[in-house]
Amino acid sequence: MKLLSRAGSFSRFYSLKVAPKLKTSAPGGVPLQPQELEFTKLPNGLVIASLENYAPLSRIGLFIKAGSRYENYNYLGTSHLLRLASTLTTKGASSFKITRGIEAVGGKLSVTATRENMAYTVEGIRDDIEILMEFLLNVTTAPEFRRWEVAALRSQLKIDKAVAFQNPQTRIIENLHDVAYKNALANPLYCPDYRMGKITSEELHYFVQNHFTSARMALVGLGVSHSILKEVAEQFLNIRGGLGLAGAKAKYRGGEIREQNGDNLVHAAIVAESAAIGNAEANAFSVLQHLLGAGPHIKRGNNTTSLLSQSVAKGSQQPFDVSAFNASYSDSGLFGIYTVSQAAAAGDVINAAYNQVKAVAQGNLSSADVQAAKNKLKAGYLMSVETSEGFLSEIGSQALATGSYMPPPTVLQQIDAVADADVVKAAKKFVSGKKSMTASGNLGHTPFLDEL
């Protein structure tokens, strides 16, 4: 199940060329019925999943366990540069041919990344999906990383990071992972400044050779025949076999990072280690997140109905924003609170929010509140898989994490199985756990961790 959090994903969009026409309509005008999701795991470990929905647009994604957590500490920023290198020259096509070819058929190539995975996705009219798939395979299996092309990406790398860091939340979340973990999940999503211009073609090749292996991949398609995907995977995605380099298990440590910059708004996040994705405890933390408040559910709403907002409103008369933070990974997780407040009121806002979580840990919650939180969580999950993009991402993420797919009805059953006591236990784990904190702004009135 995909958990909601403030951590985002990052994309680049490009385009490709014309392909043979495929017949998609049934003879005699017989209406076509959507098929069930098909799932296959090849002997080499590669997972294939597809759903033939007969939509006019097809979408294919190649998901790879190659997020920033797998970077060597000496080669940080490699996955960030890879996100920008999706249209560099390959053994089968020049950079111009890739870009011009996708444009010619009105297609789209996007590359997204999290700390766990990278996803290369092509989307276009189903009659042209074969040519888009050809470019997808070129980009992921046969990159050349010519030195002059890699060097030319330096300015894009700087701009990409600068644009992302205009949002204070990005810096807070990056610092939060840096201070919370000793390794793996501490690796940044964005290239460190000292590594700008120093990532070489050889480093990119090394990362691809050791992480873009068949056992670390999942090929997922919507609006595509399963037999076609299986044939493509067996023929073209078997170039690099094996498990690749094993990633280190994330080690939580806790700590504090404070950035004094004089901003009138103080952004602060306080978390403790929670649970890895895919187990009952992680579901309890997800329910707790929505119990406390995961953000407004009404456009331009002020989220006044959440427990956190109600608690903070009693302790501060100044404008603020507060929500629960929840991020789950394959071997760890973070849960806590995220606040935005006026500098003078930062202490009041943070303490009021923290005390509300303590109140839940002491059992001050009603079954009606827990049920409402479950309903919000279920609605959020169902809406996230309503679009083809969200559905594709969910299938790919599950395929990489577990090698299988859990349908929405099963996910909803697991959410319903969370008891009130499980939510209280999750809150207690946060309150008693070792904390990590990051804050930025004018921090004169922002408490330190030991002052909470």
Curated annotation (Swiss-Prot):
Annotated tissue distribution: Expressed in the head region and flagellum of epididymal sperm.
Pfam families for the chain: Peptidase_M16, Peptidase_M16_C
Transit peptide residues according to the UniProt entry: 1-14
Main location (coarse class): mitochondrion
PROSITE patterns with a match to the protein in the record: INSULINASE (PS00143)
InterPro entries: Metalloenz_LuxS/M16 (IPR011249), MPP/UQCRC_Complex (IPR050361), Pept_M16_N (IPR011765), Pept_M16_Zn_BS (IPR001431), Peptidase_M16_C (IPR007863)
GO biological process: proteolysis; response to xenobiotic stimulus
UniProt GO cellular component terms: mitochondrial inner membrane; mitochondrion; respiratory chain complex III
MF-aspect GO terms: metal ion binding; metalloendopeptidase activity; protein-containing complex binding
Modification type Phosphoserine: residues: S367
Cell compartment(s), UniProt: Mitochondrion inner membrane
SUPFAM superfamilies associated with the record: LuxS/MPP-like metallohydrolase
Entry-annotated residues carrying N6-acetyllysine: K65, K198, K249
Transit peptide recorded as keyword: yes
Topology with respect to the bilayer: Peripheral membrane protein
Keyword vocabulary terms for this entry: Acetylation, Electron transport, Membrane, Mitochondrion, Mitochondrion inner membrane, Phosphoprotein, Respiratory chain, Transit peptide, Transport
Keyword field contains Lipid metabolism: no
Protein task: Component of the ubiquinol-cytochrome c oxidoreductase, a multisubunit transmembrane complex that is part of the mitochondrial electron transport chain which drives oxidative phosphorylation.
Assembly mode: Component of the ubiquinol-cytochrome c oxidoreductase (cytochrome b-c1 complex, complex III, CIII), a multisubunit enzyme composed of 11 subunits. The complex is composed of 3 respiratory subunits cytochrome b, cytochrome c1 and Rieske protein UQCRFS1, 2 core protein subunits UQCRC1/QCR1 and UQCRC2/QCR2, and 6 low-molecular weight protein subunits UQCRH/QCR6, UQCRB/QCR7, UQCRQ/QCR8, UQCR10/QCR9, UQCR11/QCR10 and subunit 9, the cleavage product of Rieske protein UQCRFS1.
PANTHER family reported in the protein's UniProt record: CYTOCHROME B-C1 COMPLEX SUBUNIT 2, MITOCHONDRIAL, METALLOPROTEASE
Family: Belongs to the peptidase M16 family. UQCRC2/QCR2 subfamily.
Protein name, entry field: Cytochrome b-c1 complex subunit 2, mitochondrial
UniProt source species: Rattus norvegicus (Rat)
Organism phylogeny: Eukaryota, Metazoa, Chordata, Craniata, Vertebrata
Gene that produces this protein: Uqcrc2
